Amino acid sequence: MHHPARELPFPDALRPGARPAPHPLLAPVTGYLGTWRGTGSGGYPTLDADFSYAQEVTFSHDGRPFLAYEARAWLLDADGQPLRPSARETGWWRLQPDGRVEALITQPTGIAEISVGHARDGAVDLATERVALAPTAKEVDATRRRYTLTDPDTLTFVHDLAAVGRPLQHHLSARLRREAPGQGI
C-alpha cells in the first residue's frame, strides 16, 4: 500500500546551520554536509577499458555523532551522456573523540566495508579493516578512500581497490561541486 510522503519527526540536516545542530564530534567534517555532484574517471586491470562517470554524494546528520552517507554513480558515454547506473552505496561515518572516523559502507552488489581513518585539515582518509561479502559478490579484499575539500564547494574523491586477486591500486577519482540547497533530486 502506497503512503503519501510525510514529514519525518527528526529530519536529517544537510547544512551546518540547519536544525538539528551538528554534534560537536562532527566538527572536522561539517564542511562535507550537503549534496555534491560531478564527474570522474576510473579503471581497473580486470575491466576492458577505462571509463568516465558522473557521481552524486550526499552527507547528512540527525544531531548524533555520525554522518549518513549515500553515493550514486552513472557511466558516461564519450559525449558525457549517462549510459546506465554503475555504482551505489550507503553507510555511516562515525566520528570519535580522538579524530578517528569509522565508516560502515554497503553496496547492493553484496559488499560491506568497515573502514577506519582520520579527519584532518579538510581531508578524510579511510582504509578497510574488514570486508564482508555476500555469497555471490565479487571478491574484494581491501579499499582505500580519500575525500578532500579543496575549497568550501569542491570535494575530490580517490578510491583504491584490491579485488579479484589484484593488489591495492587506483580505481576511481572524481571532482564534485556542492549543490546549492533546494537543487537536485
UniProtKB/Swiss-Prot annotation:
Essential cofactor(s): heme b
Keyword Signal: no
Pathway: Nitrogen metabolism
Sorted UniProt keywords: Heme, Iron, Isomerase, Metal-binding
Binding site for heme b: H171
Region named Disordered: 1-21
Short motif GXWXGXG, span: 34-40
Enzyme Commission number(s) from the entry: 5.99.-.-
Disulfide bridge map: none
EC main group: isomerase
Molecular function, one GO term: metal ion binding
Domain of life: Bacteria
Pfam families membership: THAP4_heme-bd
The reaction(s) this protein catalyses: peroxynitrite = nitrate
Cofactor note: Binds 1 heme b group per subunit, that coordinates a highly solvent-exposed Fe(III) atom.
Record's subunit section: Homodimer.
PANTHER family assigned to the protein according to its UniProt record, in alphabetical order: PEROXYNITRITE ISOMERASE THAP4 (PTHR15854:SF4), THAP4 PROTEIN (PTHR15854)
Family: Belongs to the nitrobindin family.
HAMAP family attached to this UniProt entry: nitrobindin (MF_01297)
The name this protein goes by in its record: Peroxynitrite isomerase
